[in-house]
Amino acid sequence: MSITKDQILEAFAAMSVMDVVELIEAMEEKFGVSAAAATVAVGGDAGAAAEEQTEFDVVMTSHGDNKVAVIKAVRGATGLGLKEAKTMAESSPIAIKEGVSKEEAEALKKDLEAAGAVVEIK
């Protein structure tokens, strides 16, 4: 009688964490493999996922020399009041907008840099 994948998964689900760790160690010894190799492969996939980033954060690292123009640009981009925009501009580095599209992030960066700010897109 052979064991199906579903039966193996059910057995894993019923095991404690320590039992799973011991099983993995036994499998490493029996088959001459290492679980660390799987971690490296996952790390490679994470790099590919990072290339497909769809949401970006616009971070102002410095307001530069023309603080008044930067405050106006921050107000226009965020819709904040004068006091809040001034506080934000003076609190750099600070995220001006988070989770925006690449196009919106680049447009905001262009506007803030035109006002004299130093901006990064993350």
Curated annotation (Swiss-Prot):
Signal peptide: none
Alphabetized GO MF terms: mRNA binding; structural constituent of ribosome
Listed Pfam families: Ribosomal_L12, Ribosomal_L12_N
The entry's keywords: Ribonucleoprotein, Ribosomal protein
CDD domains membership: Ribosomal_L7_L12
Keyword Ribosomal protein attributed: yes
GO BP: any one term: translation
One GO location term (cellular component): cytosolic large ribosomal subunit
Domain of life: Bacteria
Keyword Ribonucleoprotein annotated: yes
Family recorded in the similarity comment: Belongs to the bacterial ribosomal protein bL12 family.
Protein task: Forms part of the ribosomal stalk which helps the ribosome interact with GTP-bound translation factors. Is thus essential for accurate translation.
Subunit structure: Homodimer. Part of the ribosomal stalk of the 50S ribosomal subunit. Forms a multimeric L10(L12)X complex, where L10 forms an elongated spine to which 2 to 4 L12 dimers bind in a sequential fashion. Binds GTP-bound translation factors.
Protein name: Large ribosomal subunit protein bL12
